[in-house]
């Protein structure tokens, strides 16, 4: 992994009581040692693998103004990170759920792209066994479960300031308010809606195959082809490219998929990030509610699984052996 740290700073927020968040600021930057670089490589890997929301700075963003000055050499990175951590503390203090944590700012380069990553990491306790097989306590940064993270593509921001996608962030696992306070701190608003783009792609694909008058098997083959392409892009950390996807679908219709989406007004970007959960709908049907969870391969619809829209009834012919065994035990009075 070609990740080069330019500058990295750590600070800390300590929750003393319900109303107090204490600020602990470092007086110097971290040295980019092999351990620090390994930690950042892991953080980059974990963050890159997650579904992210996309955004852009508001005109009045204090963070953007300070970052611009820092990039122009008018403010050093340590001073920038210290001031930003103070603003983060002030923003967090407005919320009753506010917790402390390790605040990390890192400017780094990965594959010719410069990034600024900002995150609040939990510092957790655990146990370790040493070479003498003695047990002692230790602390570690919970990188795998980080949910307060934002990353600015500095290269994109500086070369294409009108972009709506140079800033990415996680919405958090504990509710909308987590991303609210972080967006307020960043002075940012949501931009490109990747999930909406993926849903638009699926709708366009359904309409495209319908207009091409493909039969059921052909339609499913096209969906599988698109799913394979999108999955490969996702695994490679690349975006869905409408032009390259259109080439994948050459021969399906006299009109290319790219021309079809443009003519029909689907408003798809030339490229956009893949959304894993949305793309699963290409090959799977899934849903849950009212104590019922259903998940099956799309190819089974009309073969072993039938839906009657008039009565909203799903009929399954041939149940999985483990499910059938449970049903037989329960209906026969067994346990």
UniProtKB/Swiss-Prot annotation:
Subcellular location: Cytoplasm, Nucleoid
Keywords in alphabetical order: Cytoplasm
GO cellular component terms attached to this protein's record: bacterial nucleoid; cytoplasm
GO molecular function: double-stranded DNA binding; single-stranded RNA binding
A Pfam entry, by short name: NA37
Keyword Cytoplasm part of the UniProt annotation: yes
Transmembrane segments: none
Family statement drawn from the similarity comment of this UniProt entry: Belongs to the YejK family.
Protein name: Nucleoid-associated protein Ent638_2782
Source organism of the structure: Enterobacter sp. (strain 638)
């Amino acid at each position: 992994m070609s990740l080069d740290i330019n500058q990295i700073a750590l600070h800390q927020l300590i929750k003393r009581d319900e109303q107090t968040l204490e600020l602990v600021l470092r007086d110097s930057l971290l040295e980019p040692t092999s351990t620090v670089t390994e930690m950042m490589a892991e953080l980059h890997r974990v963050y890159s693998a997650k579904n992210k929301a996309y955004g852009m700075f508001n005109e009045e963003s204090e963070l953007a103004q300070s970052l611009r000055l820092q990039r122009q050499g008018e403010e050093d990175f340590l001073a920038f990170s210290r001031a930003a951590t103070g603003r983060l503390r002030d923003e967090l203090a407005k919320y009753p759920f506010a917790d402390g944590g390790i605040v990390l700012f890192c400017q780094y380069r990965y594959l010719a792209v410069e990034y600024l990553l900002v995150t609040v990491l939990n510092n957790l306790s655990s146990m370790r066994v040493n070479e003498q097989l003695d047990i002692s306590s230790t602390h570690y940064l919970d990188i795998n479960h980080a949910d307060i993270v934002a990353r600015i593509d500095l290269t994109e921001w500086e070369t294409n300031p009108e972009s709506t996608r140079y800033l990415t962030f996680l919405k958090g696992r504990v509710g909308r308010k987590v991303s609210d306070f972080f967006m307020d701190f960043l002075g940012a608003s949501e931009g490109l809606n990747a999930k909406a783009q993926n849903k638009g792609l699926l709708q366009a694909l359904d309409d495209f195959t319908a207009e091409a008058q493909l039969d059921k098997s052909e339609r499913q083959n096209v969906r599988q082809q698109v799913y394979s392409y999108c999955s490969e892009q996702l695994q490679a950390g690349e975006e869905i490219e409408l032009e390259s996807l259109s080439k994948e679908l050459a021969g399906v219709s006299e009109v290319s998929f790219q021309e079809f989406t443009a003519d029909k007004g689907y408003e798809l970007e030339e490229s956009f990030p893949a959304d894993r959960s949305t793309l699963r709908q290409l090959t799977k049907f899934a849903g849950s509610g009212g104590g019922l969870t259903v998940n099956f391969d799309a190819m089974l619809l009309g073969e072993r699984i039938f839906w009657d829209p008039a009565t909203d009834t799903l009929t399954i012919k041939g149940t999985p052996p483990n499910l059938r065994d449970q049903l037989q035990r329960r209906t026969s009075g067994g346990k």
